[in-house]
């Protein structure tokens, strides 16, 4: 199984560092970016299988555009105040899940599950 690359857009630097540490144990490489434009460029450049997107820096429309532009990438959204309505909207827009940014287990589990499903489908 080929390791997946992850692109991370997270506005809180402490949370970002925690996520980078957790993700680095499970993925080929983790690249942290500072903007949505940089996220798009990095997904293409690194052929990322996973994009983790802070919903405080992006809109549902952004999630929808990313999922159309990169249909094989697993998009995991994070938001500190996510509720059921936000989760439903994000999943309908193409995200795999919405997790609290502090729940690194949920984020890693979602990314691993969806990345392995994508790889199985491609095989």
Task: Label the model's feature ranges.
Residues 12-34:
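Two-component/phosphorelay signaling modules centered on CheY-like receiver
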Residues 34-50, 58:
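Acidic, metal-coordinating helix/loop segments flanking the phosphotransfer/catalytic sites
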Residues 38, 58-60, 81-85:
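Negatively charged, flexible loop motifs adjacent to catalytic sites
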Residues 51, 75, 98-99:
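Two-component signal transduction core modules
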Residues 60-72:
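Short amphipathic alpha-helix used as the core "switch/output" element in two-component signaling
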Residues 79-97:
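Alpha4 helix (beta4-alpha4-beta5 surface) of REC/receiver domains from two-component response regulators
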Residues 96-99, 105:
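Conserved phosphoryl-transfer motifs of two-component systems
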Residues 103, 107-122:
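Receiver (REC) domain switch/output surface
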């Amino acid at each position: 199984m080929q390791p997946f690359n992850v692109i991370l857009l997270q506005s809180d630097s402490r949370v970002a560092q925690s996520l980078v540490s957790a993700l680095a144990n499970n993925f080929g490489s983790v690249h942290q970016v500072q903007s949505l434009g940089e996220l798009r460029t990095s997904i293409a450049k690194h052929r990322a299988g996973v994009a983790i997107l802070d919903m405080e820096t992006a809109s549902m429309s952004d999630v929808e555009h990313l999922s159309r532009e990169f249909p094989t990438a697993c998009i995991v959204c994070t938001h500190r105040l996510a509720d059921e309505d936000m989760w439903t909207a994000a999943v309908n827009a193409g995200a795999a899940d919405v997790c609290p940014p502090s729940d690194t287990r949920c984020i890693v589990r979602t990314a691993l599950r969806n990345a392995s499903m994508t790889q199985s489908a491609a095989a």
